[in-house]
From Swiss-Prot:
PROSITE patterns: G_PROTEIN_RECEP_F1_1, G_PROTEIN_RECEP_F1_2. It comes from Mus musculus. Odorant receptor. This is Olfactory receptor 8G17. GO terms for biological process: G protein-coupled receptor signaling pathway; sensory perception of smell.
């Protein structure tokens, strides 16, 4: 056999969510609607923050960065998935598949660390309010966001680099609605021990470190809030964190369920369902969560409309 995966497979076919013909149109309309809401919600949030001087704070700088990640993540995945609902075969070239995988990993990992950075920002704001401006300087915020993307790129480079060392000859049908890493590896006829090891290591790192950052930040936040004597003060402090906690819970539960399961016992159908949450649903929900439960965003939106 010739070496190099492009010598055996030049293109793949995505199986999509379901093969049932009666569900294709309803699912197409459903996910098209979700994608449009995602684009409008996240771009709207970015524009609102850019145009409202009232929101030019570190908290909303991170929120605009999260919205950008969600917009990109959804755009990387959803349009190609929609093709399957209107065409019998959803073909994707090998380079296009690897590119989709690369950007998917970049934005998925970046979102994980961005949520951690946002938790750290809330910790500083509530636990050290007098030092907040000096600690969360513009340089510090830019460095954190840059670090988030660097971590995403490093992780994606490791996975894509490992993909290039294996051959594909079992099948050209990816049992997923996008070029998911585990689904691609299931088509390999090479030894994928190294790939599985890299997945396990990076999954643990990208789950444990952000989770520890978030949990430790909120542990200190809760302690600080409990020291606040006034009920109004406690309520205000909790309200600034509730939206972030909701976003964190949805993202980590769905992502962890997918990638911390051993591949040998992993059900691809279950994987598709959990993947829908963090690749399609979460990017749509985040701007809704942060706008509906955030007084500052509501005020800025009201001022812009008026």
């Amino acid at each position: 056999m010739e070496k190099g995966n492009q010598s055996t497979v030049n293109k793949f076919f995505l199986s999509g969510l379901t093969e049932q013909p009666e569900l294709q149109l309803p699912l197409f309309l459903l996910f098209l609607g979700i994608y449009l809401l995602t684009v409008l919600g996240n771009l709207g949030m970015i524009i609102l923050i850019l145009l409202s001087s009232y929101l030019h704070t570190p908290m909303y700088f991170f929120l605009s960065s999260l919205s950008f990640i969600d917009f990109c993540q959804s755009t990387v995945i959803t349009p190609k998935m929609l093709v399957k609902f209107v065409r019998e075969k959803n073909e994707i070239s090998y380079p296009e598949c690897i590119t989709q995988l690369c950007f998917f990993v970049i934005f998925a990992v970046s979102e994980s660390y961005m949520l951690a950075a946002m938790a750290y920002d809330r910790y500083v704001a509530i636990c050290s309010p007098l030092l907040y401006s000096s600690i969360m300087s513009q340089h510090k915020c830019l460095s954190l966001v840059l670090g988030v993307y660097i971590l995403g790129i490093v992780c994606a480079s490791a996975h894509v680099g490992c993909i290039f060392r294996i051959d594909f000859c079992k099948s050209d049908l990816i049992n997923h609605y996008f070029c998911d890493l585990i689904s691609i590896l299931n088509l390999s006829c090479s030894n994928i021990f190294v790939n599985d090891l890299v997945i396990l290591i990076f999954s643990l790192i990208n789950t444990i470190f952000p989770t520890l950052t978030i949990l430790s930040s909120y542990a200190f936040i809760i302690i600080s809030i409990l020291r606040i004597k006034s009920t109004e003060g406690r309520s205000k402090a909790f309200s600034t964190c509730s939206s972030h906690i909701s976003a964190v819970a949805i993202f980590y539960i769905s992502a962890g369920f997918t990638y911390l399961n051993p591949s040998s016992s992993h059900s691809m159908d279950e994987g598709k369902v959990s993947s829908i949450f963090y690749t399609i649903i979460v990017p749509m929900l985040n701007p809704l969560i942060y706008s509906l439960r955030n007084k500052d965003v509501k005020i800025a939106l009201k001022k812009m409309i008026e």
